[in-house]
Regions:
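N-terminal [4Fe-4S]-dependent radical SAM core
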Residues: 1-81
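Hydrophobic faces of well-ordered beta-strands that scaffold small-molecule active sites
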Residues: 21-25, 80-85, 113-115, 139-143, ...
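A structural motif corresponding to the C-terminal end of an alpha-helix
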Residues: 107-110, 168-179, 205, 243-255
Length: 300
């Protein structure tokens, strides 16, 4: 049991009675700020990847089985969460989504679906589909808010207003669907107050879970070009921990903390270089959590 915050592991143990693992799945989809509907460049921090929709990118059963083989190297778990992670996983024809999500959720080894998407890619028919699936097994929807600062949002090319996020949260929660919000700490130009305001904004909107992600500056991104110009600097580990811990203490106790850092492809990571060793970073964070006596909800 984590003494400092309501961790995802604690939530999974409480909900399913055992440790379950996420299976990261890629449907080969894209985003509206990549395919030209809103923009063609994508978010400023994002590496190029899938760029077109194809319903023939592999059978979902094969994808799940391959992901299970990877996880099997680390655990003997038998139950999993199907995590549709890459790009915008509701940005496709509803009939295709229904087929893929239904096939996944009906598997005996899948206990829940987690669907990462954009709040502007949740038309009523997709929300209705997710609600239908949620009556079978739990469905989580992960929304990439990143920041509640509209000026920063424009800079990172998020391409939607905060009101779109709050509306999506309201519509999903009205159907009993859990919402997870992704927030990036350390975005260019943001102050400590800006980052804390983003966490407060998500909590007030009613998010059930939160992912707190360190900004990674990756070679090959537009963000990297700005970094080379010296227009901003990456957070040090001490700066990151100071902000992270205050975020945790401002979160209500019932919000599940799904992530307190993140992974970046080492071959592309330009900064901060200290984040490359995730195990060491997590050990450092956990040690400091204890030393400082951090407690979620203390300042909520």
């Amino acid at each position: 049991m984590n003494k400092h915050y309501y961790s995802l592991n604690d939530y999974l143990q409480n909900t399913f009675g055992e440790k379950v693992y996420k299976l990261s799945l890629d449907l080969g989809l894209t985003c509206p700020n990549r395919d030209g509907r809103l923009d063609t460049r994508g978010c400023i921090f994002c590496l190029a990847g899938s760029s077109h929709f194809s319903a023939c990118e592999g059978d979902i059963f094969e994808k799940i089985d391959r992901a299970k083989q990877l996880v099997a190297k680390k655990t003997k778990a038998e139950r999993f969460i199907a995590y549709f992670q890459s790009f915008t996983n509701t940005y496709a024809p509803t009939e295709y989504l229904k087929k893929v999500f239904t096939e996944a959720i009906l598997r005996e080894d899948i206990v829940a679906l987690s669907v990462a998407t954009r709040p502007d890619c949740l038309p009523d028919e997709v929300v209705a589909l997710l609600a239908e699936l949620n009556r079978i097994k739990p469905v989580w929807v992960e929304l990439g808010l990143q920041t509640a600062n509209e000026k920063t949002a424009e800079y990172i090319r998020r391409c939607y207003k905060n009101s779109v996020y709050t509306d999506a949260v309201m519509r999903l929660k009205s159907e009993g669907i859990q919402v997870i919000t992704h927030i990036i700490l350390g975005l260019p130009g943001e102050t400590r107050s800006d980052m804390l305001a983003s966490v407060d904004f998500a909590a007030k909107a009613g998010t059930d879970g939160i992912k707190l992600q360190l900004l990674h500056i990756l070679r090959g991104t537009d963000l990297y070009e700005d970094y080379l110009k010296g227009s901003f600097s990456a957070l040090t580990i001490n700066e990151y921990m100071d902000i992270l811990f205050e975020c945790i203490e401002r979160l209500p106790e019932n919000i599940v903390v799904h992530r307190i850092t993140g992974d970046a492809p080492k071959a592309h990571l330009a900064a901060p270089t200290w984040s490359a060793d995730k195990k060491t970073v997590l050990n450092t964070i956990n040690r400091e959590l204890a030393l400082r006596g951090i407690k979620q909800g203390r300042k909520a």
